[in-house]
Every structure is written in structure tokens, then in C-alpha cells.
Amino acid sequence: MIGKNDPNVIAILDWELSTLGDPCADFNYHCLQYTMNPKLADKAYCKNQGIPVIDDYVKMYTEKINVDLTEEWDLYSAYNLFKLAGILQGILGRVRDGTAAHENAAERASGVRNLSDKAWDLVKKNFL
């Protein structure tokens, strides 16, 4: 959290999942919502909601930072899909142990295999 009248960090929420690193990797992680939410693949839905489609959104970001992410995008995507799959696997572990905080945790975390497969497909397609 940033202070109300001070641009300094005053608190960190969910420290367990915090990372400091490549801002382009962070942006790609943020863009996983387009992969995870089928509605965001629908251009008409996005337009109606005032949400840019993924290609336009990435273009806006890359133009703002003056960096071309074309070659790195699939690498960032594979990394972040594996990262999210790992997080979901941790949730499934808490479900198994009876310590999951949310009643729908098992359902929410059920995409581990799908995310891992998507990540591995990107690796095989681009890097092997």
C-alpha cells in the first residue's frame, strides 16, 4: 500500500506471493486474466465493458514503456502460467490438508493441469 499523502510504501499485503522483478513479467502476469476469463476473448464483450482487447492492451503498454515484447511474450506467458499453476497446487494442498480458507478453494484451484499444459505447450512450441 502507498501512503495517502506520501508516495512511499507503507504496507505490503499478501507478502507470501509478492515479487520484485521484471515489470514486463508482472504485466504479462496481469494479462493472464485474458487467458483465464473466456469473456475477455470476446471482442464485443470487451468493447461493451470498456475493456481493451488483449492485443490493444499490450500495444498500449509497450508503447508507453517503449519496449517490444513480441519475442519475449511467450516466455513470460509460460513462466507465469507455471507460476500460477504452482500457486493453485498450493491451494489444492491446503484443501487436502483441510486448511483451505475459502469454501470454493478446490473448484478455484482445479485448473492446475490445464495451466501447466498451456505453459508446457508454449515451451515446446517456442523453446525446444
Predicted regions located by residue number:
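All-alpha amphipathic helical-bundle segments outside canonical DNA-binding/catalytic cores
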Residues: 68-80
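Conserved NTP-binding catalytic cores of kinases and kinase-like/nucleotidyltransferase enzymes
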Residues: 3-10, 40, 65-69, 105, ...
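Active-site acidic catalytic loop and adjacent metal/ATP-binding pocket
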Residues: 1-25, 29-31
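Short, surface-exposed loop/turn segments at secondary-structure junctions
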Residues: 43-44, 70-72, 98-105
